Amino acid sequence: GTSGQAWHQDCPPDDPKYFNVNRLIYTMDIDKEKTGGQTLVMPGSHLKGLIPSMSEPFEEDKKVVLSPKKGSIVFLHGHCWHSVLPVTGEYRVSTNYRCASKGTPENITDIGIYRNIRYQFSTSSIVEERS
């Protein structure tokens, strides 16, 4: 198993016209009993801007739990607030293909926005602490 993934956005929502789209393809059933690792999403959050920091109100009770079946595809807007629950089985498999509209910066997903940090993947470094 793994510890899952904290609430985050895949790219900065600074400019709403620039974002990526994740296409998550599931090659196995993802469910609470067998695998864990369900994806949590906050409906409509792709329109709300920056995910709240740890000190700001966060209405987690409004989340939707996705438990895709084998062969399912999930489209996820890069500004959508989402997380992954801990994997409780041996493993969880999905394939993520990303795309973006023409004109979107190629490095749009280099900065991930978490509730406590902004993280730059290309340098493996925290670029901003959020409180």
Model segments located where?
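Non-heme Fe(II)/2-oxoglutarate
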Residues: C80-S131
